[in-house]
């Protein structure tokens, strides 16, 4: 009758709702039992009172067991002569209150219930430290780095993560850290629950598989991936200088119809994922992976289009981007950049890197074709609306000048550059925007 019931870890790892402990008694004692449990703050309001097959009633309680003293109190004082015992509800039914909650509210309720069941006082500090948003990859949830930072969490053990996963309906949890500054864009992600970090994600009909603990995936880039997928690149050869797991390589191959892509990547984990993603999307025969530092790439005079998808800046890749463009016809550079637009802050000219000073001599004259008043044109010469922010246009013009200089030195003759389009991707803060500059680069006709 009075045996304690403890929820097993095996049940938690199945991905089903975590079993809830309940007090079972006869229907005629249900109301008195419930009132007592509510007064003692032991009644679980997130799950329904259930009727058992034998006609008795199960009242869900907080925590993983109910001390014997409470069972004795129920039998002897709350309802003298009553009988009760503990059981487990393997598939507890959420209460109407719980069903009406948002995922964040449900998480708060479930975690607070579990924490208090462990004898730890729930506080405003702990509630403020819960995540408000996350990324879902199938049965894995990726939490942001700014949650679960309070010291109290560290003493609660791994069952905390089982509770979080159950509340949010997943089987695995990971927590994001800062991206590695080593240039490989390796995310500092910690796996909190589960035995591996491999996930699948479908984006615009393209299947990506990758390990979230080793490779990045940005949901915020979907607008740019959709845009490049809509381009007509039939017959074109592309160079993707920062291919990753195939963020842009795959849309260009699968949807834009590129003839061939040279994909550069130096993160070995991303290369494994990229190779796999090319295979599962049926385009492996139209892509060559170049593993290593793209600044040492031996390709030249080959590309109709170059993707420079690295933020906050892809400047280190500009010289090699100029090198791989076709010498006879040129091509288009898609240059990603984070641009600041703080009110009252003057735009500073781009610094010339040490590498460029050593390897690229700057000519006296360059040829550019900057459009006035912030307007841009597409590849058909159609006027587009002005850039939303003047800082974007000023950065684009500065980048255009730098690229024109590099092109003349790399190819030994003047080139003409033209801003085709400035595409906003997303904002990281009120005054930091991720944009993409489409820059057309063409060799000037030889004179006489």
Swiss-Prot record:
Pathway the protein takes part in: tRNA modification; wybutosine-tRNA(Phe) biosynthesis
Pfam families found in the cross-reference section: TRM5-TYW2_MTfase, TYW2_N, TYW2_N_2
Molecular-function annotations in GO: tRNA 4-demethylwyosine alpha-amino-alpha-carboxypropyltransferase activity; tRNA methyltransferase activity
Any one of the GO CC terms: cytoplasm
Domain of life: Eukaryota
Keywords, alphabetical: S-adenosyl-L-methionine, Transferase, tRNA processing
Any one GO BP annotation for this protein: tRNA methylation
Catalytic activity: 4-demethylwyosine(37) in tRNA(Phe) + S-adenosyl-L-methionine = 4-demethyl-7-[(3S)-3-amino-3-carboxypropyl]wyosine(37) in tRNA(Phe) + S-methyl-5'-thioadenosine + H(+)
Role played: S-adenosyl-L-methionine-dependent transferase that acts as a component of the wybutosine biosynthesis pathway. Wybutosine is a hyper modified guanosine with a tricyclic base found at the 3'-position adjacent to the anticodon of eukaryotic phenylalanine tRNA.
Family membership noted in the UniProt record: Belongs to the class I-like SAM-binding methyltransferase superfamily. TRM5/TYW2 family.
Protein name from the UniProt record: tRNA wybutosine-synthesizing protein 2 homolog
